[in-house]
Design a protein with these regions (language model features):
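Catalytic-loop region of hydrolases
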Residues: 27-103
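Short beta-strand element of the alpha/beta-hydrolase
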Residues: 92-95, 103-116, 120-128, 146
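Primarily recognizes the serine-hydrolase "nucleophile elbow" in alpha/beta-hydrolase
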Residues: 182-254
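Short beta-strand/loop motif that positions the catalytic acidic residue
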Residues: 342-350
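Catalytic active-site module of serine/aspartate enzymes centered on a nucleophile-bearing elbow/loop
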Residues: 382, 389-392, 396, 401-437
């Protein structure tokens, strides 16, 4: 077992032990983001005149897990970023400092899979001591963050969904991630100005942010791109239109459908409720601030026909939906130049999702293996180094072997070792052609 894997396993065990005893001792929660002035910009200069990645506010506090402060310093930055529509926004990132850093600082940008429509579930709130149901995911992720801190690396964790919790809006996730790194490198409070190596890592919702950051970096943030050593992603949402059909009628993941509709509506400032049935509108209202924890397994067998009016038999029959969802297909924003590790499950039946739909095929229950393979092959064709691993597991269980591979893979990238690639052995996948408008 390598040192990297040992650190990961140790981190998981320590976090599990800590979480089991810490909850009774958690202190009073801080104000939620919508009530906390730190999350708002009050400067006189219009945001549109401020460059993305500019630091607007800074505060320093202890890194909290389930409300308990740890002896780890967290620098939180409010910074300027960009919405899905290109509008100026503000967002928060958390920079966790290692207890002992040796030599030139190295940075791991960890993208959380908090998957929520509620801004109170974002990582920055959990890190500052906040407790919510959806925010339990960032608490558990401390098991993944701890090993990197123990290795002497700084960990940067952006609120990837932005201030409005724009669920599944991939390009916005990517910009929030890249701008958070610009801010972290520029802030005098973080001590990262001399950083030369940055690694990206994220699973599921975190993979959305990680992949889009990697593909947008060459054009949107070349200063960050020049420092990237690699990006590790797993459980990847490549083509959201395909995923909507894949999870339809499934036992565990069908509740993602209304969450995705809400996320697209919010990110693109469109109203999809006129196309919904009365039941669809009820779910829309019920889930407007829901996390994945409130949707997973709660709507078994849910279909599009239940959500939409009869005159809209498929999502593709709604022009405004088609126009927006086409913009969320991975690979349409550019090509990564940093090496990639991609892990994907392909036995979704374990989580109640059939793998026999035409043009879709097998997946992990929520993400589609054929889509991921096609994306990997496209990047290979553009000259990127890609290692693709496919597992006969579901989405939740794939995370285990993926982490065991991703941690040492990223460790090797920081060490300067040549990235492996298996482009020649990746099997063909699904077409990723945008829907005709």
């Amino acid at each position: 077992m390598t040192k990297a894997i040992r650190r990961a396993v140790l981190g998981v065990l320590l976090a599990a032990t800590f979480l089991s005893i810490a909850v009774p001792f958690a202190g009073a929660a801080p104000p939620k983001p919508e009530e906390d002035p730190f999350y708002s910009y009050s400067g006189s200069t219009p945001l549109a005149q401020i460059a993305p990645g500019t630091v607007l506010k800074t505060r320093t506090l202890n890194y909290h897990v389930v409300g308990v402060p740890l002896p780890v310093t967290a620098v939180q930055l409010l910074y300027r970023s960009t919405s899905e529509l290109g509008e100026p926004t503000v967002n928060v990132t958390s920079v966790l400092k290692p207890l002992l850093s040796i030599g030139t600082p190295q940075v791991v940008a960890y993208q959380s899979f908090y998957d929520s429509l509620n801004p109170a579930d974002e990582p920055s709130y959990a890190i500052s001591g906040g407790l919510t149901l959806g925010g339990a995911i960032p608490q558990v992720e401390s098991a993944l963050i701890g090993p990197e801190l123990l290795a002497g690396r700084t960990v940067v964790i952006a609120d990837t969904e932005g201030e409005g919790a724009d669920f599944a809006a991939g390009p916005e996730y990517g910009k929030n991630t890249l701008d958070s790194l610009k801010a972290a490198l520029a802030s005098s409070a973080t001590g990262l100005s001399s950083t030369k190596k940055i690694g990206l890592i994220g699973y599921s919702g975190g993979a959305i942010a990680t992949e889009w950051a990697a593909e947008l970096a060459p054009t949107y943030a070349p200063s960050v791109n020049s420092k990237l050593v690699g990006a590790a992603i797993g459980g990847v949402l490549v083509d959201p239109a395909h995923n909507l059909h894949y999870v339809e009628g499934s036992l565990s993941w069908a509740g993602v459908m209304p969450m995705a509709i809400i996320g697209v509506s919010r990110a693109f400032h469109i109203d999809l409720t006129p196309y919904l049935s009365e039941y669809g509108k009820q779910l829309y209202a019920k889930l407007e601030k829901a996390s994945i924890a409130e949707a997973l397994g709660q709507y078994p067998g849910l279909t599009w026909a239940q959500l939409a009016k009869p005159e809209y038999p498929t999502p593709e029959s709604i022009p405004v939906y088609v126009h927006t969802v086409n913009q969320l297909i991975m690979g349409t924003g550019g090509t990564p130049t940093t090496p990639l590790l991609i892990g994907q499950g392909a036995l979704g039946e374990l989580e109640g999702t059939a793998g026999d739909k035409p043009g879709i095929g097998e997946g992990d229950g929520v993400m589609i293996a054929g889509d991921v393979r096609t994306l990997a092959r496209e990047y290979c064709e553009h000259g990127d180094k890609v290692q693709y691993d496919q597992y006969a597991l579901g989405h939740i269980t794939t995370a285990v072997p993926w982490i065991a591979t991703a941690v040492p893979w990223l460790e090797a990238r920081f060490a300067g070792l040549t990235a492996p690639q298996d482009c020649g052995s990746i099997e063909p996948g699904n077409a990723l052609t945008p829907i005709a408008e």
